[in-house]
Amino acid sequence: MVHGFEGCSDSHYMLGVADKAWRTGLNVIRLNQRNCGGTEHLTPTLYHSGMSDDFAAVIRELAAKDGLHDIWAAGYSMGGNLILKMAGEVCGRVPSLQGLVAVSPNIDPAACVEALERPANWFYQHHFLTGMKARVRRKAAHFPNRFDLTLLSRVSTLREFDDR
């Protein structure tokens, strides 16, 4: 299972669906995207909607090391977009991937950012932007001189955040 933008493996929707799947007898793995769920210290990179390689690597690892050959992926919002992207990229080269479910995937991330910039969606943009700025500050503490924190004070939209 892959969470959405600014979520983590412990997000309420992830826990709820994982619990239901577990109770039906399925094995469940809840993945954190890079830098999410308290993993900022593990890599100097920031996550983004193009990082689908991580999920293909996890599926290959589960097949090779754990002998799992009937794997389904589920992703929410940005996580849904990422697993759809991954499936298109691996297209049959990861035979253990049997299928996937994408819940409310943001198929067009640029259009999603544009929608978030509308005045009616100010709350959501503010929520995401506040979270992303906090994430960069946490990363900067682990990787000094990698991020210019002075730029954060001038960022007021997600588009500006992406551009810097």
Predicted segment positions?
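Catalytic nucleophile-loop/oxyanion-hole region of alpha/beta-hydrolase
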Residues: 20, 34-72
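The conserved beta1-alpha1 loop
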Residues: 2-4
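Glycine-rich, phosphate-binding/catalytic loops in enzymes
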Residues: 16-19, 46, 90, 117-119
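Conserved alpha/beta-hydrolase
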Residues: 7-10, 18-42
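Alpha/beta-hydrolase-fold enzymes
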Residues: 66-164
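Short coil/turn segments at secondary-structure boundaries
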Residues: 12-14, 41-44, 114-115
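Short, hydrophobic alpha-helix immediately C-terminal to the catalytic nucleophile
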Residues: 15, 19, 56, 84-88
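Alpha-helix N-cap/helix-initiation motif
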Residues: 6, 10, 44-48, 98
